[in-house]
Design a protein with these regions (language model features):
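Structural motif at transmembrane-helix junctions in multi-pass transporters
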Residues: 25-29, 83-99, 192-196, 250-266
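Hydrophobic/aromatic residues within the transmembrane alpha-helices of Major Facilitator Superfamily
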Residues: 7, 11-15, 43, 75, ...
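Hydrophobic transmembrane alpha-helices of multi-pass small-molecule transport proteins
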Residues: 124-146, 291-310
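Hydrophobic alpha-helical transmembrane segments of multi-pass membrane transport proteins
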Residues: 8-15, 19, 68-90, 179, ...
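Small-residue-rich segments of transmembrane alpha-helices in multi-pass membrane proteins
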Residues: 34-44, 101-109, 134, 162-164, ...
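C-terminal transmembrane-helix exit sites in multi-pass transporters
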Residues: 100, 106-126, 273-293
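Membrane-interface interhelical linkers
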Residues: 1-8, 15, 22-26, 31-35, ...
Length: 312
């Protein structure tokens, strides 16, 4: 049951990304599109909390006994989002996808192995290590290799004189992924402290919304907003916030139960499989890209990796 839930919430992320991309084209700003997503997600979580009788605000007693870092989930989510926005035009789509994924896998294993942030302690056994290697191979076969082969000619045209080092940006991509895994662990701990995953998710999303709002006000992208275009936007694009909120809530619920590494692993597998399905059938306005044989091999490596990590 937990495994299926982890896969399911991961599969929502590519759909959320497609909806956010559509909204970004309408409002002409990635930050403004993110603000809509965060705000709608926060509202959705607030309604769920009210319906369940869960308080939106925490008491002073709970605030005092909860470590300060437990409230960093929203900040980490915001930093991860901002990093992806900044990295895309510099590194391209392939590295912007693969580097954060590697960062997430690495950090989730470290969190589990050392029990960081009071998470479930799951030492890295030899079988789990092999599972991690299998996951990385699967990700490379599915995401990196097909795009790399297509872009090889363009990359070969770049010379050292005209191609500045991108090492720091690549390192930023890995760190961004590590922050996202840390967010899962922190939100899971906060949910445990509050005895409510929905309240933890609401607090995280509220902080994220505030931070995105600060960025939007600073860059003044709201001046480009045209209400006439916003009214013409397909209603489904507003579901992006709902999907994002569901992802954060489910991760906060699952992390204390099965460990951060398992949550991140299942989410990534669900995310990749969902992306392949979208490309295969050209769903959500995506260009139709039939699954390649090498990607099928990659999926097999993914499932072997999941079995190695989850069963041992």
């Amino acid at each position: 049951m937990y495994l299926l839930l982890g896969l399911f919430v991961g599969s929502l992320l590519p759909i959320q990304t497609a909806f956010n991309s559509k909204m970004r084209g309408i409002v002409q700003s990635p930050f403004l599109a993110s603000l809509f997503s965060f705000a709608i997600g926060t509202l959705f979580l607030a309604l769920i909390a009210i319906f369940q009788g869960v308080p939106l605000l925490i008491t002073s007693d709970v605030f005092a006994r909860t470590p300060w870092w437990a409230y960093l989930g929203g900040l980490l989510g915001m930093l991860g989002l901002t990093a992806n926005i900044l990295l895309f035009p510099i590194l391209g789509s392939v590295q912007t996808v693969i580097l954060p994924i590697l960062g997430q896998l690495l950090m989730s294993i470290l969190i589990d192995h050392f029990g960081l942030f009071h998470t479930l302690l799951r030492p890295l056994s030899f079988i789990r290590f092999l599972g991690l290697i299998s996951l990385i191979v699967g990700v490379l076969l599915i995401v990196f290799l097909p795009s790399y082969l297509q872009q090889k000619r363009q990359l070969m045209k770049e010379t050292k004189e005209h191609a500045p080092s991108k090492f720091l940006w690549q390192l930023t991509g890995i760190i961004a992924g590590m922050l996202m895994s840390t967010q899962v662990a922190i939100n899971g701990f906060l949910g445990k402290q509050l005895h409510s995953s929905i309240q933890a998710a609401f607090i995280s999303f509220s902080i994220g919304t505030f931070l995105v709002l600060v960025v939007v006000l600073s860059e003044k992208s709201y001046r480009k907003l045209q209400l006439s275009l916003l009214k013409q936007a397909p209603k489904y694009v507003y579901l992006a916030g709902f999907f994002g909120a569901s992802y954060v809530f489910c991760n906060a619920y699952l992390a204390p139960l099965i460990g951060t590494g398992a949550v991140v692993t299942l989410s990534l597998v669900g995310q990749i499989i969902s992306s392949l399905v979208i490309d295969q059938f050209g769903l959500l306005g995506a260009i139709k890209k039939p699954i390649k044989f090498i990607q099928v091999i990659g999926i097999i490596f993914l499932f072997i990796g999941v079995l190695g990590i989850e069963l041992y």
